[in-house]
């Protein structure tokens, strides 16, 4: 076991595991912390191939955030969660570390090959619009 905490590894790993495996480690951590019985934690089959995509400005790109655009075909087929921490009007700088992310999203695919192919083209289907 690498981690059992809801934040131990960061990058929303526990949230992604809940979507992929249907097991809520965060709920169990809270239950354990307050002395409640745990909900069944079991090994289940993964529902597809999942990834977290950290959203950030492209190298050299900076300005005032206006919006993010995702190709509608990609959004409808693969994107399951989008969590933006940046809002319209915020200043955006090129990505240099985790504190520069604009948000993140979880995507689900039917195969590893499909995931690799779509993610390799992220610069084609994801646009950060700055003023």
Ranges and model annotations:
Residues 5-63:
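Active-site "cap" helix and flanking loop/linker of ATP-utilizing ligase/carboxylase catalytic domains
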Residues 56-90:
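Glycine-rich active-site loop/lid that clamps phosphate-bearing ligands
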Residues 19, 67-74, 120-124:
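Short intrinsically disordered coil segments
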Residues 40-44, 72-73, 91-96:
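Short proline/glycine-enriched turn/loop segments at secondary-structure junctions
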Residues 86-131:
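Generic C-terminus detector
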């Amino acid at each position: 076991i690498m981690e059992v905490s809801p934040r131990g590894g960061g990058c929303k790993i526990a949230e992604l595991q809940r979507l992929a495996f249907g097991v809520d480690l965060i709920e169990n951590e809270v239950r354990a912390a307050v002395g409640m019985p745990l909900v069944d934690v079991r090994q289940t089959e993964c529902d597809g191939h999942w990834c977290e995509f950290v959203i950030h400005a492209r190298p050299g790109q900076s300005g005032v955030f206006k919006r993010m655009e995702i190709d509608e075909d990609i959004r409808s087929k693969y994107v399951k969660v989008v969590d933006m921490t940046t809002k319209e009007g915020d200043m955006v700088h090129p990505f240099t570390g985790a504190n520069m992310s604009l948000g993140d999203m979880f995507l689900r695919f039917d195969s590893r090959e499909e995931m690799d192919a779509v993610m390799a083209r992220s610069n084609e289907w994801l646009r950060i619009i700055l003023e």
